Amino acid sequence: MFATKILRNAQSIKNELPHREVVKMAYDLHKPRSTAIRNLNENHEEPILFMHGIFGSKKSYVQDSKLISSATHTPVYTIDLRNHGESAHAQPFDYATLAADVKEFCDSHKLDKVKLVGYSLGAKVSMLTALQYPELVKSAVIIDNAPIPQPQIQLFMKQYIKAMKTVLNEANISADDKDWKNKASAAMKRFLPNGVIRKNLLANLVNKPPKDFDSPVIDFGDGQIHFLNPIEQMEEMAVEDVTDWPTELTKDLVFEGPVKFIRGLKSPFITDEGYEAIQKHFPNNEFHDLNSSHDILDQRPTEYVKIINDFFNIHRYESAPDSTILGHKDHPQTQARRSHL
């Protein structure tokens, strides 16, 4: 059994992800429990799109999304980015491609004035979507990330990958093992002592795939447990692409709509360089700092949800200003308005 598993893992490394310019992303739609808006449906003119972080999914913050939907009287789409959750496994995985997937989602669902919420990986996807496709975006909440390359976080990505590959390649946990999730957590612990991080990564570990879900590189019928992400194929993409940013592509792009940045004061993600880039690309910004690490959604769940609700409710009836393409020297900097909690 163990030798067979090693062979399968060696074979899976050779399998390349298919190349797809865009994929149709899996999603869940959360509607308000009660609303004054009649006939609220999937085509409501200003829905919220909630995008998860690396190795997250549309299932990561379901209750938070429901709370946001009801508090803002707005439908919330939680989406699976490619290579996550129930969305297709495909390359490439650069930010321009991920933003193109978001545009395809908006086009296919006839959404033309969306409000974006993005955390970590999803934050960068949200920022690039707003910069490249400003006609689609009214406003955004960006949770603890900045529009710059961040090689300093590659170490975190490598640790995540090591821990997940240990489960797949060394732990030898069968799908019918009743204690499979606890054993997987124990295998990951030496690389990831933080239990919250392990819990979030393990949310993508399954002993059977979702109904009607298939992967070109994962054999879900081999009797073993698997992550829903193509981990072997994503190793380089997670380390290189996720920590990168298309600087040349965005050097002259500015989004003029309102953007709230939620920053963790103990997080390394928004540096001074990142703060300057935010002022350049998103002049109509405001900051809200939380006493948190990068894991804001787990450490300060009530606070971040309230910040999102307040921001979207305040800007609900504003018309989005025209977004333009400007050089950095051609537009005034707007001093970020900071609030602390």
UniProtKB/Swiss-Prot annotation:
Residues 47-301 form the AB hydrolase-1 domain. GO terms for cellular component: mitochondrion. The keyword Hydrolase applies. Coiled coil: none annotated. It comes from the Eukaryota. One of its GO terms (molecular function) is transferase activity. Probable alcohol acetyltransferase that uses acetyl-CoA to synthesize acetate esters from various alcohols. Not involved in the synthesis of ethyl acetate. This is Probable alcohol acetyltransferase. The lineage of its organism: Eukaryota, Fungi, Dikarya, Ascomycota, Saccharomycotina.
